[in-house]
Amino acid sequence: RNALSLSVETLAMSVLATAMAGVAVLLTFLPAARNLGNGELGGAPSRLWTVLYYLVRATFTLTRAIPELVWALIIIFFLSPGILPGALALGLHNYGVLGKLSAEVVENLDPRPTRALRAAGSSNFQMLFYGIIPQALPQFLTYMLYRWEVVIRTTVVVGFVSAGGLGREFRLSLSFFHYSEVALIIFWYLILVVGVDLLSAWLRRLARFD
């Protein structure tokens, strides 16, 4: 029962981390695309957009350059141990990874639909929401689900520094040589990984279908 409860905590940590990273990226990945600021997609070149490009790109680089374990050590220094520090650490690192991937999706978009909208008299706002986001959103969702698969595997790593879930219990059981408990934790961990992989694959198929 304890292992099942810890598995639920681990799953909750991974979902929370992926959701936080996904929402943050969804709000910031457009300024990180170079072709939006320089007018390649049909909009007018903007100096403000160029400044935002370098600022957001630097944020992506910083957050993904620091490993999840280091983020967890820093956050636990300020917060009490639990799944929230682990989710924040995983979310920060994956924010940088997912943000870079999503920005590159926009940079590789076909510019013809947005240029056609601009030629038809669309505003910048209409061009973004009718020409860019509909093209980028399916690939963004696919990348976010891929990162969820990575996050569920990394929860054990941040758990080693008391960030909650199966990782913390795994470290304690290993320290006291309770190998039967270690085997049980690994069993539940494998169930989580396989379950998340299958669910993520199904959701990715839905995203591609849409």
Identify the meaning behind each predicted range.
Residues 2-34, 38:
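Transmembrane alpha-helix signature in integral membrane proteins
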Residues 26, 30, 72-77, 86, ...:
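Transmembrane alpha-helix boundary and packing residues in multipass membrane permease domains
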